[in-house]
Amino acid sequence: MRPTHAQPPLLRVNVLLFLLLTCAAGVWAQSKPIEPCEPAAAPTPAAPKCPDKAATRASKTLIDDNIPADPEVEKLLAPYSSKVHELSVVIGTLSGQLKRSLVGSGSMGNFVADALKSQATKKNKSIVVAITNGGGMRKISIEPGPLHTSDIFELLPFENALITVDLTGAQLLKLLENVTRAHDAQSGARIQFRWNAQDRPEFIRAKLIDSAGHESEIDPAGTYTIVTIDYLYKLNSGNYALLRDGKNMTPLNLTLRDAVIDHVKSETAAGRPIRAQTDDRFQQIGPGPSRPIEIR
């Protein structure tokens, strides 16, 4: 008879072998790549069912003065109707064509800048120069004849407010140089310029000019008050960045458009027509540009 103590080692071997095979199977299962499941096909939408026949009915109604007014609609339009009526009011008579052109924005620029200076000076007597940008004038020309409020709204559609700024004479000269280069408008100075080889206006010199036409030198160390629009002041870049270097910026609580309208009404009340000024506030020295230049 075999001794009974030899059986346990054989049993342990079998158990260990079973455990090893089980672990190997688990490792093989983990290393096997998982096949992706095929997505289920989307159901085909059912075709919409349309009726075999469709019936439509149309009617025609003539809209003319025989249709009674709707009180609710009239109430809704009333505030706007009064504004439209204001736009159609004749505020003056234009004696010649106003037109934008190159340097200084032409007679249109002179008209706007002169009106700006005229009305702003009523609020601040120390103003010597008015400046505004030609790009803010949205009409190329206005023909002679009755001048309506709507003409000014079309010309100046933006809510640009007037401000005054104190500049040194050196800053003012630099500003007038930038005005010349940008084809913008000014009132209160006489500027000499030439056309350079790139067909761009090049500033030479400038002097102040009063309402009687008398010239005076600009002292680089002096202090001068100008009026312009808040849009140019807020730009803080390009031709008008130096406005931020000025002192005592003061709002005048008046928009450019209202200043022009008030100027026209004031001239009309005084019995004077609105003239298209083409004076020598911009004096060209030498020949003009070598090619046609588009006005934008």
Outline where the language-model segments fall:
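Bacterial N-terminal signal peptides
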Residues: 14-24
